[in-house]
């Protein structure tokens, strides 16, 4: 087999592939044997009809087309390997010649991984900065713990104020008529939380337990229920009870309730240690990101649109998954925000372009430095996944048997190894 490759503009390459006549004839014969077993020709058992009879009934063109379908993907893959070409798009292929007894010739073009011109890999003067945990941060964590164990008790004053919890019945009216979703009973609202429409909670300030009052509000123009957006409504609200939040006392008993420690001081020390560990971890992550960003910024590469499009597609898929965890579909999100799919795509493009450039630069660094991922390292990662997710054994074994997933995991591991290499270079600098 012969293959020629020529560069075009914008990371495209054109190719022409010629498969030997003898090899193509073997493929045509293999196509005949396969198709002969699949059809019935009168007077012959399935698979036993002579080729001449088969061709008279179904035509020689059917055999040639089947042979092309079988050999072309294999020949294209071999051509990529011969030319050491890394495609980033599906090829556009045209069959030039396909006749039994003659070479199979096809040509086409494909977009390939762009050339990356690397700059510096180190010497950026990036320093790892680990902030010291303050006493205020520790106290904020303690306050959050107290908030979690807070209880609501009756406010003896009986008057609604900022921070109060009012137990209410309410019904809303627009132009004197009640509307769907505008009624509730025994609802507890925290004044100042912003849970309700702007103006509703403020309208309850000063109300007494047992009092009924009217609160006038205007629904926001971007309100999710479009039939209510921008409209004025009057809510009839009855305050049944006023409560206030009561925090547990910060003492040793509290420490024992929320932790395995016996004293508040031990709890404080543990919180400070955990905050320090988190700060160190974040500092390490920030350092890694800054190093990778600096290396990418110092390199030059023409980022292909097809890769940006694919990255945006992946990002939208991830976003859709995040929404699903909140019980929201992407269509619902579009309705709530008023943004179209095209708007979302356009918003994500700059970030996607940056991410694609980073991937291309890291791949170029790995190639220049000579970093690789061995089969042993790949298998070790699968073993690690099996140990980490004991309930997913069957699924992980399926992934282990998938050539596509193995290739993806190898790329991910190589990317990790490359980042570690750059971090090491810049830590020593």
Curated annotation (Swiss-Prot):
Q: Does the keyword Cell cycle apply?
A: yes
The PPIase FKBP-type domain extends over 163-248
Q: Which terms in the Gene Ontology molecular function aspect does this entry carry? A: peptidyl-prolyl cis-trans isomerase activity; protein folding chaperone; ribosome binding
Q: Where does it localize?
A: Cytoplasm
**Tell me, which GO biological process terms does this entry list?**
'de novo' cotranslational protein folding; cell division; chaperone-mediated protein folding; protein transport; protein unfolding
Which PROSITE patterns is this protein grouped with?
FKBP_PPIASE
Give a yes or no for keyword Lipid metabolism in this entry: no
**Top-level taxon:** Bacteria
GO terms for CC? cytoplasm
Matching InterPro entries, A to Z?
A: PPIase_dom_sf (IPR046357), PPIase_FKBP_dom (IPR001179), Trig_fac (IPR005215), Trigger_fac_C (IPR008880), Trigger_fac_C_sf (IPR037041), Trigger_fac_ribosome-bd_bac (IPR008881), Trigger_fac_ribosome-bd_sf (IPR036611), Trigger_fact/SurA_dom_sf (IPR027304)
Where does it primarily localize?
A: cytoplasm
Instruction: Identify its protein family.
Output: Belongs to the FKBP-type PPIase family. Tig subfamily.
Domain topic, free-text comment: Consists of 3 domains; the N-terminus binds the ribosome, the middle domain has PPIase activity, while the C-terminus has intrinsic chaperone activity on its own.
What protein name does the entry list? Trigger factor
